[in-house]
Amino acid sequence: MDRIENAQMNSLGTRKLYYENVHQTDFTAVVMECVPDKEEGYYRIVLDASAFFPEEGGQSADKGTLNGQEVLDVSIKQGILYHKTACEFPVGTRITGHVDWNRRFDFMQQHSGEHMISGLLHSHFGLENVGFHLSDREVTLDMNGEVSLEQLRLIEQEANAYVWKNLPVNISWPTAEELASLNYRSKLALTENVRIVEIPGVDLCACCAPHVDTTGQIGLIKVVNVQSHRGGVRINILCGNRALADYTEKQDSVWAISSLLSAKQPEVAGAVARAKEDARLQKERANALQAELLKVQMNALPSPEKVRHVLLFVGELDAIALRNAVNTLTGKYSGYCGIFAGDDTNGYRFIVGSASCNCQELADRMRRELSAKGGGSAPMIQGNVAVTADTLQTMWASL
């Protein structure tokens, strides 16, 4: 491992440019260490200074490049930043770094929005944030108590009202004495080098991550999901451009549904409910007709004196009706009684029963010869198979 000894870096860690200027995306720095990871085939680069925020505080690391080479990850240990790259950089050389600003700003919007929601839940309901995760795909915050959807909607409305006020987001590094006098949110008991993020009247929290300059830069805060989680709730939020993209996607869906169902946009939920109920009734009627057709087919079967095994094909029919029909047949015929629901194109659901034959033996054969899926017991088996009706009739003829 190559290394340049640097007393200041060893005592204070890498100079963190994102704390000096959160908007800085381009920088130059000297390579202090180049640590090969032989197992992974990567290198971990230590610089004297870096604008890359690492994976820390529940947030994924910044993305970007060093000398045009992709930075795959950034981690921090004892204040030193390690940049994971596929390329080796000689120790002592000066290199150029670039941070993906669009992604940085996106994460700033999400994290500042999370502070506002968590801070308001804390001040209104005494809830503590006990978990936080921010990645490219989601923002989740875990609270240690229950909150109703109605309460959450009020919190969301209040948070956005503070966004519109364009409040400053203040960053400070209070002394130990100053820290002792502050009533701030924190998951850990901290005593020194504590970075405080303040949104006046909304939140006061210890945090290591980059934040927006003012609440107006967040743009929009939207709660998109809430569910019970470990005695509390897990809340999913989207802020800024993510919230806009989510709204656009959902608006496109509403437009499409509105057109398909010939309903006004505010009325699509009711239109979908009616369409669902209509489909249920249609399915019930279709099942009733299929059940009647099945009875006709069963009555048309040869007598038990002429055949031992019987096989029937029907359209879509619910499992209860299929099972009842098979039970009726097994009370009449001594061999395998099979009913297959479906068609040659989409495959068949089946139930096979017998009062005297071992249906598990038939299931084994169907798996071997027809790649059928399913199982059951000696009196009855059920499953799925993707073959033609002719193939099944050939098998039944061989029983």
Where do the model's predicted regions map?
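A glycine- and charged-residue-rich anion-binding loop/surface
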Residues: 1-399
